[in-house]
């Protein structure tokens, strides 16, 4: 499958950027987040599950089983698909170089802040 716009995130700010892009700019083709089980092994400040975005917008959501995107399910998913551009909001971890290399135009990250400035 070919995904043009992909958003990475695990927080309410991630939901906000998905909503903004989807409603104001262009369709979001995929959201990559972590499964709730990952939060039991990692400190995730302000975690918010994003699987509801499938129902809200019809956007597929991939839930990784590793915050570092190294689990077999996620590696296979990334290997079997093509990606154009990524937006990272509220991920709280470095995205590995092998994942960055999968995106034709790169992944662009934003740091959260108080008050959603």
Where are these regions (language model features)?
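One-carbon transfer enzymes
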Residues: 1-117
């Amino acid at each position: 499958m070919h995904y043009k716009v992909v958003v990475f995130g695990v927080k309410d700010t991630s939901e906000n950027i998905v909503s903004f892009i989807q409603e104001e700019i262009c369709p979001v083709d995929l959201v990559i987040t972590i499964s709730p089980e990952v939060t039991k092994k990692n400190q995730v400040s302000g975690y918010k599950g994003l699987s509801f975005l499938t129902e809200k917008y019809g956007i597929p959501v991939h839930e990784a089983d590793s915050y570092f995107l190294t689990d077999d399910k996620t590696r296979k998913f990334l290997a079997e698909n093509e990606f154009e551009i990524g937006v990272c909001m509220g991920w709280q971890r470095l995205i590995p170089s092998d994942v960055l290399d999968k995106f034709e135009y790169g992944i662009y990250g934003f740091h959260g802040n108080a008050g959603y400035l």
